[in-house]
From Swiss-Prot:
<dbReference type="GO" id="GO:0090729">
    <property type="term" value="F:toxin activity"/>
</dbReference>
<dbReference type="GO" id="GO:0005576">
    <property type="term" value="C:extracellular region"/>
</dbReference>
<comment type="function">
    <text>Causes dorsal fins drooping in fish. No effect is observed when injected into mice.</text>
</comment>
<keyword id="KW-1015">Disulfide bond</keyword>
<keyword id="KW-0528">Neurotoxin</keyword>
<dbReference type="InterPro" id="IPR012631">
    <property type="entry name" value="Toxin_26"/>
</dbReference>
<dbReference type="Pfam" id="PF08097">
    <property type="entry name" value="Toxin_26"/>
</dbReference>
<keyword id="KW-0964">Secreted</keyword>
<comment type="similarity">
    <text>Belongs to the conotoxin T superfamily.</text>
</comment>
<keyword id="KW-0800">Toxin</keyword>
<protein>
    <recommendedName>
        <fullName>Conotoxin au5b</fullName>
    </recommendedName>
</protein>
Amino acid sequence: FCCPVIRYCCW
């Protein structure tokens, strides 16, 4: 899961 919102956060 990746959320390109204010910095990238992929897990």
